[in-house]
From Swiss-Prot:
Main location: cytoplasm
GO biological process assignments: queuosine biosynthetic process; tRNA wobble guanine modification
Subcellular location: Cytoplasm
Reaction equation(s) it catalyzes: 7-aminomethyl-7-carbaguanosine(34) in tRNA + S-adenosyl-L-methionine = epoxyqueuosine(34) in tRNA + adenine + L-methionine + 2 H(+)
Cited function: Transfers and isomerizes the ribose moiety from AdoMet to the 7-aminomethyl group of 7-deazaguanine (preQ1-tRNA) to give epoxyqueuosine (oQ-tRNA).
GO MF term (any one): S-adenosylmethionine:tRNA ribosyltransferase-isomerase activity
Name listed for the protein in its UniProt record: S-adenosylmethionine:tRNA ribosyltransferase-isomerase
Group of enzyme by EC: transferase
Cited PANTHER family: S-ADENOSYLMETHIONINE:TRNA RIBOSYLTRANSFERASE-ISOMERASE
Record EC number: 2.4.99.17
Length: 355
């Protein structure tokens, strides 16, 4: 298939630049992957789509304040976006500046209102990423909390604000490391989670530290030629056990977000392909899911509306059928749903292979 097959026209005013006042106030477009049928509603209607015995799988990564501003010691301005923490004092990062820093370059990173400055050094370059070592005794996370900004996606097109520290974060986040939010999870608040549990729906948590590569455009014509960026994922034993128990009782595995889908399917790719049962997974993954992929674990998913020609709309198309998904997106535009990270959501069931 061509990347252009996944294009759709999106009016700029449908890009959500701020979240709704309440997390659950978003709208929900329900798509039956088998029939293509659509139903319009509110996000709280997700409760009606869940059955006792189902398993909801969330991504519990925590977004770190990964964006920093400063200058080289020689004076040139720069912007640093952390992609991955290497250890307590070093990171891999994207660096934007008029000239790329060379190994040994000193960086002076600016703090907030108190004028704090942190020194760092560029140690090495790894393709598009720079290895940066902080010349500060504090751990990386502490430094980022002190001087970093929330790394809002480029299409939000505004500076980060204090409210983003809470709203660009799920309520159940636990493990710091993401530089983009697992956005399907932003719609859940504690009262809704309590209602979900009270209905007899089980919950489990994987971790996938979403990287900045999630916003990179696909730069090839044929989707089969695209190489995915790599991200670290964890599917612990308790998730494997929860999935087995769900299957045994006839329930469905419902992934909250494409990152949860990719985590679960990455684990399955390693073991089920060998004819072995699902096993824990703690590794980098570059799994690329596009139409033709055979899903092994996930039966339904909650997901936001994604960018045209992105790997994420390709994943949803693989899940629910290309024609169904593109028609749903056309309907969403016509009905003026809000798009992308702070936008509305879909509840999508999987399209089964025809007998």
């Amino acid at each position: 298939m061509q990347v252009s097959d996944f294009h759709f026209d999106l009016p700029d005013e449908l890009i959500a630049r701020y979240p709704m006042t309440e997390r659950t106030a978003s709208r929900l477009l329900q798509l039956d992957g088998q029939t293509g049928a659509l139903r319009h509603g509110q996000f709280v209607d997700v409760l009606d789509q869940l059955n006792p015995g189902d398993l909801l799988v969330f991504n519990n990564t925590r977004v770190i304040p990964a964006r920093m501003f400063g200058q080289k010691a020689s004076g040139g301005k720069l912007e640093v976006l952390v992609e991955r923490m290497l250890d307590e004092h070093s990171v891999l990062a994207h660096v934007r500046s008029s000239k790329s820093p060379k190994p040994g370059t000193r960086l002076i990173l600016d703090g907030g209102a108190d004028g704090e400055k942190v020194e760092a050094e560029m140690r090495a370059r790894h393709d598009a990423l720079f290895e940066i070592h902080f010349l500060d005794p504090r751990p990386v996370l502490e430094i980022l909390e002190a001087i970093g900004h929330m790394p809002l996606p480029p299409y939000i097109d505004r500076p980060d604000e204090d409210a983003d520290k809470e709203r660009y974060q799920t309520v159940y986040n636990q493990k710091p490391g993401a530089v983009a939010a697992p956005t399907a999870g932003l719609h859940f608040d504690e009262p809704l989670l309590e209602k979900i549990r009270a209905k007899g729906v089980e919950t489990a948590f994987v971790t996938l530290h979403v990287g900045a590569g999630t916003f990179q455009p696909v730069r090839v014509d044929k989707i089969e030629d695209h190489h995915m960026h790599s991200e670290y994922a964890e599917v612990p034993q308790e998730v494997v056990d929860a999935i087995a128990a769900t299957r045994a009782r006839g329930g469905r595995v419902i992934a909250v977000g494409t990152t949860s889908v990719r985590s679960l399917e990455s684990a399955a790719k390693v073991t089920l392909a060998q004819g072995k049962p699902l096993a824990p997974f703690f590794s980098d993954t570059d799994i690329f899911i596009f139409p033709g992929y055979q899903f092994q674990v996930v039966d339904a998913m909650v997901t936001n509306f994604h960018l045209p020609e992105s790997t994420l709309i390709m994943l949803v198309s693989a899940f629910a059928g290309y024609d169904n998904v593109m028609s749903a997106y056309q309907a969403a535009v016509a009905e003026q749903y809000r798009f992308f990270s702070y936008g509305d959501a879909m509840f999508v069931t999987r399209r089964r292979a025809q007998a």
